[in-house]
Structures are given as C-alpha cells and as structure tokens.
Regions:
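Solenoidal tandem-repeat scaffolds enriched in leucines and small polar residues
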Residues: 167, 173-262
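Acidic Gly/Asp/Thr-rich repetitive segments characteristic of extracellular carbohydrate-active
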Residues: 42-80
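Short glycine/acidic-rich loop motifs that flank beta-strands on beta-rich extracellular proteins
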Residues: 86-89, 107-113, 147-155, 176-183, ...
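N-terminal extracellular ligand-recognition/capping segment immediately after the signal peptide
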Residues: 72-114, 119-122, 144, 172
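Parallel beta-helix/beta-solenoid
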Residues: 99, 118-152, 156-175, 192-195, ...
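Sec-dependent signal peptide cleavage junction
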Residues: 23-34
Length: 404
C-alpha cells in the first residue's frame, strides 16, 4: 500500500520530467499554415516561425539570420508553399539551401528594394572584399515577382562579392525599368533551369534580364562596397529560358583593363526579345554555345572595344587602363541556332555583331582587336545581317550557315 501511495505521489514528477525531455529534444514546434523552418544537416529543427503573407520578411530574415550565426553549420531553410509579400529586402546567408518550391514572393518594397540581396554594409555594417560576402548558397525553385503597382525600377535579386552560389529553377517575372537579377564580383555563380519573363519600360541600351555587371559604385552597383576591382569569374547560365523581354543576358559596361573571365552561356532558349539575346563586353575565356535564339532583334554581340554609344567605360580617373589590357579573347561562339528579325528596338537585325578596334573617345588609347575568337557551327536565319565583324585578328569563322 505504501509503495502504491509513493507511486501516485511521484507520477506527476515523472510526467513533468519526460515532458521536459521532449521539449528539449524538439525546441521548435511545426506550424500549420504559412511558416519558415531552418533545419541543420542532421534534419533537426533549429528555428521555426509563422510567416505573415502580407509581410513575410521579418520571419524569413530571422530564419536567414539563424543560419548566418554559424551555430548550426550548413542548413536548409524551407518556406511553406504560398504567396507572400516582401516589404524589405532579405539578406541571404552563407552555407545554406533556401528551398522556395511552390512559393511566390512579391517585391512590395516602397522604394527601390529587392527581394533578396547578398550581405552589404547597409544591412550588416561591414564592407566585403573579393568574394567574401556570400558563399556556398543555393536558391532553389520559387517565383520572384512584383506586387501590383510596384514600378520602382528595382531588381528582384542582387548579388555581389559572392562565391559558389547556385540559383536553380527559379522564375523571375514582370520587371519594369530595371533588370530581373544583377550580379557583380561573383565566382562560380550558376543560374540553371531558370525562367526570365516579362519586361516593360526599358530599351535596348540597358535591359538585360540577367545582368553580369561591373562592381562600380556610382552608376551600376551602388551600396555593395568594397569597390576593390573584383571581377566576375566562372559564371554559368545554363538551360534557362528568356522570353518576352528587351534583352536576355550579359554585360554592357566595362572597366578598361579588367575582364569578365570564364563566362559560360550554354543551352538556353531566347524567344521574342526586342533587342539582343546575349551581350558580351570584355569577356575572355568565354563559351557561348548551343543556345536557341528565336524572333529576336539580335543574337549575340561581342565587344572588346566601344568608343561611343550606351556602354560605360571606367578608367583609373586619369584615362589610363585599370590592370593590364588583354590581347587574347580565348573565347568561342559555337553551335547556336539563331533567328533574328526587325523589332521595335532593332531596325537592323543581325545574327552576330563582333566588334574590336582602335580606341578613341571613352577608351584609353590602344588597339582592342577581337583576337583569338572562334565562331563556328552556328545556324543563322536573318532578315538583315548575318555575322558582322570589325578588327577581327587570328579568329576562326567556319561552318556557319546563314539564310536570308
């Protein structure tokens, strides 16, 4: 009898003890409905919170900050499928996968804000050099779009000072007066299986949906110091679709004497573009291959020099080159299928435009020939020019089929 009374008295203590263990083993509850969850490499939940569909940024940013703390190693951040408004740019974190499968995020910033950015001084209080701001980050799936009425001329995604970043299967939609995504000072950054669609109030002069840009503080990539001359290297755009845009992917502007190195644009589909599908400016060791370009104003533009027009060329302030002027492109444009026609932005359609020459005007003095470029195996259907080239040296043009 005494043992029974002892058991009854101790039972609540035993239950409380086991409940405490259960809570300690699972510190965050799963939320029904809209939520964001952070799991570490073992699958343990390290953060979970409900997300307000009208203002998802606070909860999402807290999840990203949990990863950025570094306390849990490489993590996966998952958002419950649904549609959410982002009223402030969310700062991405290193060492994570952000899974947005089934998620639509709407850029609802009151000003020129974005949906996602890499860390910068405004948000972290730090300047970043080289490729140190964001590393080992994957953005998977999801749709990035604009809230109704947002015509503020802002990008959906801006990345700078970043390394080993992959954007996989994400849709970028309905940009007005800007780019869908911008990248500067990136190393081993990949856009694969992405969709870029819908663009208004832009012109051929500066309208790439995916802009591979220069890290210049005043006109092209403000708010991402340090401005240390870091260039893009090993950038890959593969198996993406670009449709109903002004321009597709590439670079307009240049630092004289600095180069975008190792850009690969492969296996993409471009259709119904008013301007140029692929723009290469100061590219070396580049590969442009197996792309399908249909109903566009121009297929591929490759510049090593431009003295006037829309391109911005930046020097050291006294008109001298930054770094060393390159004399070897070491690039190839091969096995592309291109169909071009006259558009509202391109009254003289061309399959390809390859441009080098002696500098004058904006460029420091020198010869910027297109040297050692291979253009072969391309099929071009055009209502205007086929392949137009200026100052091509030691280049190979072979087995290209042009139909008018």
């Amino acid at each position: 009898m005494q043992k029974m009374r002892f058991f009854r008295r101790c039972l609540p203590l035993f239950l409380a003890f086991w409940l405490l263990l259960a809570v300690a083993g699972a510190p965050f509850a799963a939320y029904a409905g809209e939520s964001v969850t952070v799991r570490d490499g073992s699958g343990q939940v390290r953060y979970a919170a409900p997300m307000d569909p009208e203002n998802a940024c606070p909860a999402l940013q807290s999840a990203l900050d949990t990863v950025r703390s570094g306390a849990y190693g490489t993590c996966t951040v998952t958002v419950t499928p649904g549609k959410y408004r982002m009223t402030k740019s969310a700062v991405l974190a290193s060492d994570m996968t952000l899974d947005l499968t089934g998620v639509t995020l709407l850029n609802a910033n009151a000003g020129k804000g974005n949906i996602f950015i890499s860390p910068n001084r405004d948000r972290t209080g730090k300047d970043y050099t080289g490729y140190s701001a964001l590393e080992n980050c994957t953005l998977r799936g999801g749709t990035l779009d604009y809230a109704p009425g947002n015509t503020n001329g802002s990008c959906l995604l801006r990345l700078a000072h970043c390394k080993n970043v992959t954007v996989d299967g994400t849709a970028f939609l309905n940009n007005t007066d800007s780019h869908h995504a911008e990248l500067a000072a990136g190393y081993n950054v990949r856009f694969v299986n992405c969709l870029f669609s819908g663009q208004t109030n832009q012109t051929e002069s500066s309208a790439e949906a995916l802009q591979i840009d220069i890290l210049e503080k005043n006109r092209h990539f403000a708010n991402f110091p340090a401005y240390d001359g870091t260039m893009n290297q090993k950038i890959t755009v593969e198996d993406c679709t670009f449709q109903d845009l002004i321009c597709g992917v590439g670079t307009r502007n240049a630092f004289a004497g600095r180069y975008q190195k190792g850009v690969t644009i492969r296996g993409n589909t471009f259709r119904r573009l008013q301007g140029t599908a692929i723009v290469c400016t100061n590219y070396v060791d580049a590969v442009i291959e197996k792309n399908t370009i249909t109903d566009c104003g121009r297929g591929v533009a490759y510049y090593m020099c431009k003295n006037s027009g829309v391109i911005d060329v930046f020097t050291d302030g006294s008109g001298k080159v930054l770094g060393k002027r390159n004399t070897d492109c070491g690039s190839r444009i091969t096995d592309n299928t291109i169909s071009v026609c006259q558009t509202a932005e391109m009254d003289k359609p061309r399959g390809m435009f390859l441009y080098g020459g002696k500098a004058a005007g904006k460029m420091p003095a020198g010869n910027y020939a297109v040297y050692n470029l291979t253009v072969s195996g391309n099929t071009i259907t055009t209502t205007g020019g086929g392949i137009t080239g200026t100052d091509l040296q030691n280049c190979t043009l072979a087995d290209n089929r042009i139909t008018h």
